[in-house]
Amino acid sequence: MADFDMVLKCWGPMEADYATHGGLVLTRLFTEHPETLKLFPKFAGIAHGDLAGDAGVSAHGATVLNKLGDLLKARGAHAALLKPLSSSHATKHKIPIINFKLIAEVIGKVMEEKAGLDAAGQTALRNVMAVIIADMEADYKELGFTE
């Protein structure tokens, strides 16, 4: 619980502008890990230099952060929120678990820059994301999805 609370203390600035921060998260993910762009076919035709200003990238980034905000606010009691997310990402989108670990690190960097998440907050976010990702991985296995 303490980890969730520590991350939530810095969540306000992220929540205040999901589109901008979400676009930044996805653009940075695609820049730092170019292989992840292949997992988003709807962004395939966008030139790398245009990703940051693309409305679709920002909108999807906003969705990612909005869902993460819901998971954070559940403070660990997130099974009902996570199951449908795990199901769609395993069966429809076919997103390997490693990619959630990659985006979690990017979210941590963006939160440090834009929301003042300090070193202790970074550790708390890693702990929180480890729990969420482990639960997703269990859902994936239950669904028979292995990368």
Curated annotation (Swiss-Prot):
A Gene Ontology biological process term: removal of superoxide radicals
Keywords linked to the UniProt accession: Cytoplasm, Heme, Iron, Metal-binding, Muscle protein, Oxidoreductase, Oxygen transport, Transport
SUPFAM superfamilies reported in the protein's UniProt record: Globin-like (SSF46458)
A GO CC annotation given for this chain: sarcoplasm
Domain Globin: 2-141
One annotated GO molecular function: metal ion binding
Domain of life: Eukaryota
Compartmental location: Cytoplasm, Sarcoplasm
Quaternary structure and interacting proteins, as annotated: Monomeric.
Name of this chain's protein: Myoglobin
Encoding gene, per UniProt annotation: mb
